[in-house]
Amino acid sequence: MSVKIQLLSDLHLEVHPHFVPGPAPGADLLVLAGDVGSYQAGTLLKDDDFGLGRFSPKNGWPTPVLYVPGNHEYDSLDFDATHARLRQTCERLGITWLERETITLQQLMGAKRFAGRPQPHEAHEAHAARGPSDAPDAPAVRFVGTTLWTDFDALGPTSVLSATSSASSTSANAWAQQQTARDKAFRAANYYLKKALTTRHGELMLAAQMRDQALLCQTWLRDALNEPFDGTTVAITHFAPSLKSADPRYGMTPGTAGFCNALDDLLPLAQLWLHGHLHAPSDYTASGCRVVANPLGYARKNEQTGFKGGFVVELPVKYGIFPHPD
């Protein structure tokens, strides 16, 4: 059996305000992997909900919706105030906020049926084992989400440096190479970040501040993925987890480290990883994890040819017994 996940990202409704993809036939839920809409200079969005209202279950969207914020939602705004505003917007619209949050499919859907759910005779053993206070059989799936951001270290000597490396175990030369690569990535990113005009604590939020946020998200994500779970794990991030997602139009340049992380060691901890940010689709398997992106991108840059509005990822799942949520 499978759970069917519709995936959309990088819709950039600030320049495509009339773009409204429809629900994918048979989808069990929708994942919005960031950069849905922003209020950067010249935005064409007329509402105050970052374009999320059109995906609201309260406004008629037929499935649960999971949302991980991107980077552009913060353009021309204060980071912390916007973070709170986005979360409140999701709560108002009935969209599940997934920034440094984990939710199971059982929590997300409750007792609702979904397209991939087996009939009772197909889960006889599970039904027989269920006690009177248990909820109906449900797929054992958890969604672990964060914007993730980037540490700008993807193009450094990552085969030597890792999250567990220490100064005593790593050569001074390797650390110097890492810093040089990071500085180049900072310069490439800051060219654009200065135009984005995101502020934090009264100052522009540039690459160094973004790295600080990325390290917080990485620590959270690593801990969350390492939490024992008897089921299928889906990671959802805006920034890519691996250089394997790099946009082939640009190759491996310092700017690539502003889009991709080198967190390949985390891939075995998930069965599916959904992301956005790069305006190039991805669908590959690494270390047993399928990595998928389905971004719309910018029409003016001819980036939309690979986008599929009704794209659905079918996730094979096993079924478990869950107690009724409190």
Predicted regions located by residue number:
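Charged helix-capping and loop-helix junction motifs
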Residues: 46-53, 81-85, 251-261
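Beta-strand-turn-beta hairpins that frame and shape the catalytic cleft
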Residues: 1-6, 103-118, 134-144, 231-232, ...
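Active-site-proximal loop/helix segment associated with metal-binding centers of metalloenzymes
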Residues: 115-118, 127, 141-234, 241-245, ...
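Binuclear metal-dependent phosphoesterase catalytic core
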Residues: 2, 124-130, 247, 253-271, ...
